[in-house]
Amino acid sequence: MQRSIIIGRPTITFDTIDSTNDYAISLVSNSNPNEGTVIWAQYQSKGRGQIGSNWSADPGVSLLMSVILKPRFLMAYQQFTLNILASLAVRSALASYDIDTHIKWPNDIYIDRKKICGILIQNVLQGKGIKNAILGIGLNVNQDHFDLPLPNPTSMRMVSGT
């Protein structure tokens, strides 16, 4: 029998945190949180992307969250499947706002040549499988300016003009 999870039960919220992914990793290392637990924050002081890159966003204007998943049905060699699913889900969500995007594999969502979203997945492997996966998403929603030297960022607000 397949089980189903509800993303967002529970939800842990912060005004400010170093990194939602770091908090989620600490949770799975020190306890057994429910699959689907969401950690989100108004601001991350040490948000990051792939290969140690920084993710920067002004307080209260972006979606900054991590989801704890337990995809034990996936083998370690299949972990890129999570990137595919997460990227397609974000792209689908943005399409519901009539925002046409493309995916820059493995983890970025772009509008034309401007980045609107980054995805960071950190897996905890156990044997040949995946014990836990931390799915981090940073989506620029209402940010109307960006500090340089970010490479061509944009936001939902900037794209829609509202």
Label each residue range with its predicted role.
Residues M1-S96:
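N-terminal lobe of the biotin/lipoate ligase/transferase fold
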